[in-house]
């Protein structure tokens, strides 16, 4: 009797193969043949689970976003400094988060001129930025930041800083190391907290 096929597991393997391919070769290299080769499968398997390249890209992006959210929640859970934990969790500090960032950046490039993809990207970014803003509000309420700070402005600024530093770390990893990224976050938080 043939082994039971776990469709969710197969889809997940295909999505991870697509993410790795995007990270290694760019989104233009994403083909059924290359994905099939990465999982030692067939192109028929890829087309069975994903009816279009767009569907695969969307699922890959959503999977990377879900992984990032889970890591963010775990980092903040029980942290004595949830804002610092949040900012660090948003950065590409390890192989898994670098993979996610590479997929997000590729997706962002595709979203230019595509209203549906832009909406999805903007929604995810707004959710992350809102979280940073709420954590700043919490710090102000707890007396860890001066009340003169505008949470919306600083939330936007910190989120833009995280995005810029993350991009720099992908294109210039020799300079923008994980240690340097952590240092930059620490410096920014100290500046905010001292007023």
What do the PLM-derived regions correspond to, one by one?
Residues 13, 17-55, 59:
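Helix-turn-helix
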């Amino acid at each position: 009797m043939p082994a039971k096929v776990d469709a969710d597991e197969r889809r997940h393997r295909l999505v991870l193969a697509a993410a790795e391919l995007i990270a290694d070769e760019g989104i233009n290299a994403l083909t059924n043949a290359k994905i099939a080769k990465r999982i030692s499968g067939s192109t028929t398997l890829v087309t069975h689970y994903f009816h279009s390249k767009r569907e695969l890209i969307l699922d890959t992006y959503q999977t990377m976003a879900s992984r990032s959210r889970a890591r963010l929640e775990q980092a903040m859970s029980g942290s004595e400094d949830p804002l610092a934990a949040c900012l660090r969790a948003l950065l590409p500090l390890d192989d898994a988060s670098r993979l996610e960032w590479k997929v997000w950046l590729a997706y962002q490039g595709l979203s230019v001129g595509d209203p549906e993809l832009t909406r999805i990207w903007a929604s995810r970014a707004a959710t992350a930025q809102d979280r940073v803003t709420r954590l700043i509000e919490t710090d102000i309420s707890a007396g860890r930041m001066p009340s003169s700070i505008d949470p919306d402005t600083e939330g936007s600024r910190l989120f833009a800083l995280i995005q810029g530093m993350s991009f720099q770390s992908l294109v210039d990893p020799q300079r923008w190391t994980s240690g340097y990224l952590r240092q930059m976050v620490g410096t920014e938080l100290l500046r905010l907290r001292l007023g």
